[in-house]
């Protein structure tokens, strides 16, 4: 498997996990998601969004949240922020919880 197809497989798995988690979300908030052209958009009741974009040339996933944008690299079986070292789903849970106004956990 070449490096680009491996990256796409890992990014697909990441987005599928997000979809499955949101499909099973039992909170009061309505969180919609849409994936188009490798870009996933989460839309919250208050109109705020989280956009998760693939950066194929860099082999990174870039989520943009209300609080800011982040770059994540895949290593040791997980995605980690290139600046803080924080794990992807921890950061996504934090951002989604803030934007939904209730706890949203992806991990």
UniProtKB/Swiss-Prot annotation:
Swiss-Prot/TrEMBL keywords: Iron, Metal-binding
UniProt xrefs under InterPro entries: CyaY, Frataxin/CyaY, Frataxin/CyaY_sf, Frataxin_CS
Any one GO molecular-function label of the UniProt entry: ferric iron binding
GO terms, biological process: iron-sulfur cluster assembly
SUPFAM superfamilies referenced in this protein's UniProt entry, alphabetically: Frataxin/Nqo15-like
Origin: domain of life: Bacteria
Coiled coil: none
Role noted for this protein: Involved in iron-sulfur (Fe-S) cluster assembly. May act as a regulator of Fe-S biogenesis.
HAMAP family on file: CyaY
Name of the molecule in the record: Iron-sulfur cluster assembly protein CyaY
Organism: Yersinia intermedia
């Amino acid at each position: 498997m070449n490096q680009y197809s491996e990256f796409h497989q890992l990014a697909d798995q990441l987005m599928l996990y997000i979809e499955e988690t949101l499909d099973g979300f039992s909170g009061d908030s309505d969180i919609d998601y849409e994936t188009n052209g490798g870009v996933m958009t989460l839309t919250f009741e208050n109109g705020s969004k989280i956009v998760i974009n693939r950066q194929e040339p860099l082999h990174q996933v870039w989520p943009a949240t209300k609080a800011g944008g982040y770059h994540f690299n895949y290593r040791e079986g997980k995605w980690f922020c290139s600046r803080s070292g924080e794990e992807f789903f921890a950061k996504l849970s934090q951002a989604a919880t803030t934007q939904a106004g209730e706890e949203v956990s992806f991990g």
